[in-house]
């Protein structure tokens, strides 16, 4: 497991409950806060979080191209390659060390969108925590309406002020996540939608911990 740096593993590495969480440098700096919050919420440490570094956030977590929302950097279509690495490299390496585990995906913002999209692509995951996910992403809601998710459990959350933005695309996030919840309910998915206080940038570590804790119930 040469890709598996000790600094990127949190919790019990031998646990049967493994959460794969795509992260950038800022997310990684908050992992200790996230895991301490998770310990407090769960009351146990029967879980392992593997923080999976993402080289290019806008490219590697999105399923198709889209124009920029802020600045000049648009979005790529690298989600398929990122998922392929998780399924064909990371999980087999973990299984070789400690087999018969349950694998989950968790992510914040665009990583939350990636986790949700991956749940439609593969039945490998026992659950997905899409925390403040970028479901405003162009074409996402219509795409999701035409597909059936393959993971049995989904945690959704959003800040109660996230839709109160001047950006016309991002202001749709509230309507989009409500629609997402309804679609999953109609497909018989075990889904919950939790509203957190604040905008997109409030308490990401605690919000992510709450999603993981729900999946551990």
Per-region residue spans from a language model:
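A short loop-to-beta-strand scaffold at the N-terminal edge of the catalytic core in hydrolase folds
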Residues: 1-12
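Serine-hydrolase catalytic machinery in alpha/beta-hydrolase-like enzymes
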Residues: 10-97
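The conserved beta1-alpha1 loop
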Residues: 20-24, 132, 158
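Alpha/beta-hydrolase-fold catalytic nucleophile elbow
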Residues: 53, 108, 131-132, 157, ...
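Gly/Ala-rich beta-loop-alpha elbow adjacent to hydrolase catalytic centers
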Residues: 106-111, 115
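Active-site signature of alpha/beta-hydrolase-fold catalytic machinery across serine-
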Residues: 117-121
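A conserved short beta-strand
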Residues: 124-138
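The feature captures the conserved acid-bearing segment of alpha/beta-hydrolase catalytic domains
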Residues: 135-215
């Amino acid at each position: 497991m040469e890709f598996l740096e000790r600094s990127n593993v949190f919790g019990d590495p031998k646990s049967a409950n493994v959460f794969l969480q795509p992260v950038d440098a800022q997310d990684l700096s908050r992992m200790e806060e996230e895991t301490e919050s998770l310990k407090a919420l769960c009351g146990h440490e029967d879980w392992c979080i593997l923080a999976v570094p993402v080289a290019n956030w806008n490219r590697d977590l999105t399923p198709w191209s889209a124009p920029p929302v802020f600045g000049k950097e648009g979005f790529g279509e690298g989600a398929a390659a990122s998922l392929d690495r998780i399924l064909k490299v990371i999980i087999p390496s973990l299984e070789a060390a400690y087999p018969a585990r349950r694998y989950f995906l968790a992510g914040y913002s665009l990583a939350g969108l990636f986790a949700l999209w991956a749940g439609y692509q593969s039945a490998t995951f026992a659950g997905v925590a899409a925390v403040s996910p970028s479901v405003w992403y162009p074409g996402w809601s219509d795409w999701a309406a035409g597909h059936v998710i393959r993971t049995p459990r989904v945690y959704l959350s959003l800040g109660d002020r996230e839709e109160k933005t001047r950006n016309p695309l991002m202001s749709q996030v509230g309507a989009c996540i409500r629609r997402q919840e309804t679609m999953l309910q109609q497909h018989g998915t075990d889904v919950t939608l939790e509203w957190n206080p604040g905008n997109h940038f409030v308490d990401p570590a605690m919000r992510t911990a709450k999603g993981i804790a729900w999946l551990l119930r």
